[in-house]
């Protein structure tokens, strides 16, 4: 079957059914939700613009698709119960809440749904248009060999991207000019084992660890069946859809060839784009790849026992078998499907990335599902080639496939065309938890043996699909958005050369908190905003990100400032009972309300200079209860102000008064980190590796405990001396190493190799009157990302101004204007592990903006005591 032909067949299916390999249909004009996950951009091609979720469930033996944007608004258990009661037994689906409200409602809804949820899908939309010289008629799929789509559906084709949209009047006057919407869709972990009372099960798998690739795209489309269509150029065939019969007219030969030529360019570009994403994921993960090639063949086959035979008749679809062989990468599975009738499938390529290879075999069955265990040699190959422990491979590689030989008739409602067994049979992709309960031999899965079931492990990569829908006018496929900022100058921070990515006449469009377009107004797609803002040539940048602060504390250390002016050093003050331990005493004595009241003015000062995201570290409690208190107050700050707070546990900030460093380190690792991770109070663990704090070995002990509990790693390193802490942190994949004034070449090389961000803190350098400048030139030459932060703290950097920190970095560290602005946006997002959705103006990113009254970007760095902020935007909302 051809690629567009298969896409056309998929588009024509009723919305209540899935297509082969478990991919569901979608609505004509989705009103997308915004899941947590953003797809990585490819090296070229359009960028992900809008996200939408789909839940696939089974009802009365048939597959139903549920759009996430159909869920009624609400949060928590009550909303989930209410939605389930209201929608139970209907085809309408879930529905809901914006991603900013989390997935609580969705989890509770699925937990109480009588239908069994089988898969959760996400999709990203791209927008482009057909070149004016390409003439493609509407309903292009009508020329497909067997008339897959009814006339009322939108045409399906593959279109070249990148051309500017035609004007409305030209497009409206010519029905051959069409605009396109392209969807890339992925399936993620299914909430198949949600606890019905509490709804405890995340919808998405955890972040990939070392050696795992975090992104996977698989193309599930073939090419056009041009020859078959030409052979029946004027033939009229009947296509039954329930009680309705529609006649499909074949298009002339030249139109079919013309359409095929138009399709080829974008198919090639789509393949290259998705391959680029896959290769980037593999490079990041450092893992191998294995390919499963499923070759679906067709042949004429008469089934005398069913009374089926002859060309064009109804046929039986069944599996002919599968061969498994080993390769250098592990196992390559070649699957051959034999299908009667008129099916003409092309090759399907499914690539498995990461550390899971699956060895299975396919057997025809009549009434039961047989458990098919992975071949021992395949498990050994997977373990050897991908570094996965053997027991984990055995637990996670349970793949079961059941296919009954049954008769599929072309007239069956919603089962696709004749001769296509895979399309006619309902198919489901069911992702299980890491240790699935395997059914006993003979036990049926929901839906019975007529369904193809593919049970995969928790670590199985996502599957995606490229579909293109064409529209006759720009307005028909206009990109709907909530807010549009226009007549602006942009600093996108998304330039290929690492610069500011300046756009002179720019536009930013936002839909449900995500950017759907950011770039030149002249190249913007057709947009239909609900609200518009004329920026009057002001500058728009990503919202500022302060990636290193100690914002939550009590007390005042102005007396230490006076001591430092008289010549006392940091070590002298600490030895006299001052420094960090002085703030520890004050913070322990303060309750939540006092800490909150003391922290709010500092936070407000940062927000007033365009900060939309900041990290807040603990570290002034040094007991479990007091550290939790600090993290709890950090969460309260995020609830009281429109800002995203990233909490970091810094229990290993200093040794408590009268304590022992090793004994306290053991307490941090065995008591504090497990408790804080269990409560979800922190995303990362930091440690102060210095001769007056924690040693190299103790820092490593903290890192091991943090990784064991799934927390990111950060470090205060080389601030006062070279303890080789940055090199250690890089070895453990740390997000960032901060301060690093005394960093040596070995540490620079380690950070460059690991992608660890260098967080520079000019405020602390200035305030302590340090003379050891961080090795900026060497870091720059090695390609280490350079982030900036205020290091807001009471002792060494009582600074709440990111704009002043930029000026200090330029003046003291000789950083460029571009580096200073990138340090508080793009690179700061990377230091917090949020580069996929923050720090740049790009489709698919969170719509966090700072709008400035300046003449040029250099004004942000050049002027001191100057605040040119005009407006701050968080998730598309003015603050």
Curated annotation (Swiss-Prot):
SUPFAM superfamilies xrefs: Composite domain of metallo-dependent hydrolases, Metallo-dependent hydrolases
UniProt cofactor note: Binds 1 zinc or iron ion per subunit.
Binding site for Fe(3+): 548, 550, 716, 791
Annotated EC: 3.5.2.7
UniProt key word Hydrolase: yes
Reaction(s) the record says it catalyses: 4-imidazolone-5-propanoate + H2O = N-formimidoyl-L-glutamate
Regions that span the bilayer: none
Chief place of localization: cytoplasm
Pfam family, one: Amidohydro_3
One GO MF term attached to the UniProt entry: iron ion binding
Presence of keyword Iron: yes
Function recorded in the entry: Catalyzes the hydrolytic cleavage of the carbon-nitrogen bond in imidazolone-5-propanoate to yield N-formimidoyl-L-glutamate. It is the third step in the universal histidine degradation pathway.
HAMAP family named among the record's database cross-references: HutI
Protein name: Imidazolonepropionase
Organism expressing this protein natively: Xanthomonas oryzae pv. oryzae (strain KACC10331 / KXO85)
Lineage of origin: Bacteria, Pseudomonadati, Pseudomonadota, Gammaproteobacteria, Lysobacterales
């Amino acid at each position: 079957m051809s690629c567009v032909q298969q896409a056309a067949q998929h588009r024509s299916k009723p919305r209540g059914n899935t297509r082969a390999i478990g991919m569901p249909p979608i609505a004509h004009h989705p009103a997308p939700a915004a899941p947590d996950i953003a797809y990585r951009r490819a090296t070229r091609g359009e960028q992900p613009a809008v996200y939408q979720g789909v839940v696939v469930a089974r009802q009365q033996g048939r597959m139903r698709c549920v759009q996430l944007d159909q869920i009624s608004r609400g949060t928590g258990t009550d909303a989930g119960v209410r939605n389930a009661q209201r929608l139970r037994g209907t085809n309408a689906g879930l529905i809901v809440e914006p991603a900013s409200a989390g997935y609580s409602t969705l989890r509770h809804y699925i937990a109480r749904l009588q239908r069994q949820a089988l898969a959760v899908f996400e999709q990203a939309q791209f927008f482009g248009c057909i070149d004016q010289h390409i003439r493609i008629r509407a309903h292009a799929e009508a020329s497909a060999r067997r008339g897959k789509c009814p006339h009322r559906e939108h045409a399906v084709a593959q279109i070249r991207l990148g051309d500017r949209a035609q004007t409305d009047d030209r497009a409206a006057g010519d029905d051959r000019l069409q605009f396109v919407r392209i969807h890339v869709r992925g399936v993620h972990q299914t909430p198949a084992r949600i606890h019905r009372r509490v709804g405890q099960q995340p919808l998405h798998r955890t972040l990939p660890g070392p050696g795992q690739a975090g992104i996977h795209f698989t193309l599930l489309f073939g090419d056009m069946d041009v020859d078959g269509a030409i052979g029946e150029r004027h033939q009229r065939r009947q296509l039954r859809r329930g009680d309705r019969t529609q006649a499909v007219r074949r298009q002339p030969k030249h139109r079919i060839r013309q359409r095929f030529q138009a399709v080829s360019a974008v198919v090639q570009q789509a393949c290259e784009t998705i391959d680029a994403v896959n290769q980037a994921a593999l490079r990041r993960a450092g893992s191998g790849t294995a390919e499963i090639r499923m070759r679906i063949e067709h042949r004429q086959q008469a089934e005398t026992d069913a009374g089926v035979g002859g060309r064009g008749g109804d046929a039986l679809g069944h599996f002919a078998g599968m061969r498994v062989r080993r390769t250098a990468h592990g196992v390559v599975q070649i699957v051959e499907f034999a299908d009667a009738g008129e099916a003409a499938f092309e090759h399907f390529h499914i690539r498995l990335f990461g550390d899971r290879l699956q060895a299975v075999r396919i057997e025809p069955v009549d009434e039961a599902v047989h458990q098919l265990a992975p071949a021992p040699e395949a498990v050994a190959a997977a373990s050897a080639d991908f570094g996965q422990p053997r027991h984990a491979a055995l637990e996670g590689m349970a793949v079961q496939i059941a296919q009954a030989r049954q008769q599929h008739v072309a007239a069956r409602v919603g089962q696709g065309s004749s001769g296509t067994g895979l399309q006619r049979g309902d198919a489901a992709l069911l992702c299980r938890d890491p240790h699935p309960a395997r059914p006993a031999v003979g036990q049926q899965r929901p839906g019975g043996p007529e369904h193809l079931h593919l049970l995969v492990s928790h670590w199985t990569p996502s599957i995606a699909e490229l579909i293109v829908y064409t529209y006759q006018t720009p307005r028909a496929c206009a990109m709907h958005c909530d807010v549009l900022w226009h007549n602006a100058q942009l600093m996108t921070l998304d330039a290929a050369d690492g610069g500011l990515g300046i756009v002179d006449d720019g536009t930013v469009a936002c839909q449900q908190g995500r950017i759907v377009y950011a770039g030149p107004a002249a190249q913007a797609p057709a947009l239909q905003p609900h609200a518009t803002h004329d920026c009057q040539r002001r500058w728009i940048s990503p919202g500022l990100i302060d990636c290193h602060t100690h914002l939550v504390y009590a007390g005042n250390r102005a007396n230490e400032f006076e001591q430092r002016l008289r010549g006392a050093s940091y070590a002298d003050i600490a030895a006299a009972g001052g420094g960090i331990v002085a703030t520890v005493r004050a913070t322990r004595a303060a309750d939540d309300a006092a800490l909150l009241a003391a922290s709010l003015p500092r936070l407000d000062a940062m927000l007033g200079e365009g900060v939309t995201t900041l990290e807040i570290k603990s570290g002034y409690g040094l007991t479990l209860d007091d550290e939790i208190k600090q993290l709890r107050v950090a969460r309260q700050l995020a609830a009281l102000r429109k800002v995203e707070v990233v909490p970091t546990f810094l229990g290993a900030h200093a040794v408590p008064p009268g304590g022992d460093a090793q004994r306290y380190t053991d307490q941090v690792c065995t008591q504090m980190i497990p408790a804080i991770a269990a409560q979800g109070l922190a995303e990362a663990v930091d440690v102060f590796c210095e001769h007056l704090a924690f040693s190299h070995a103790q820092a490593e002990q903290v890192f091991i405990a943090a990784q064991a509990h799934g927390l990111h790693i950060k470090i205060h390193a080389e601030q006062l001396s070279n303890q080789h802490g940055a090199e250690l942190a890089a070895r453990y994949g740390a997000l960032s190493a901060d301060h690093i004034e005394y960093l040596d070449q070995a540490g620079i090389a380690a950070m460059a190799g690991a992608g660890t961000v260098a967080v520079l803190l000019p405020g602390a350098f200035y305030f302590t009157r340090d003379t050891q400048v961080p090795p900026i030139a060497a870091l720059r030459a090695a390609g280490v990302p350079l982030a900036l932060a205020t290091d807001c703290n009471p002792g060494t950097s009582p600074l709440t101004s990111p704009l002043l920190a930029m000026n200090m970095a330029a003046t003291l560290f000789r950083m460029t204007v571009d580096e200073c602005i990138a340090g508080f946006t793009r690179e700061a997002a990377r230091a917090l592990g949020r580069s996929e959705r923050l720090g740049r103006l790009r489709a698919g990113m969170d719509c966090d903006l700072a709008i400035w009254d300046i003449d040029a970007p250099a004004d942000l760095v050049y002027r001191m005591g100057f605040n040119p902020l005009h407006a701050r935007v968080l998730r598309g909302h003015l603050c």
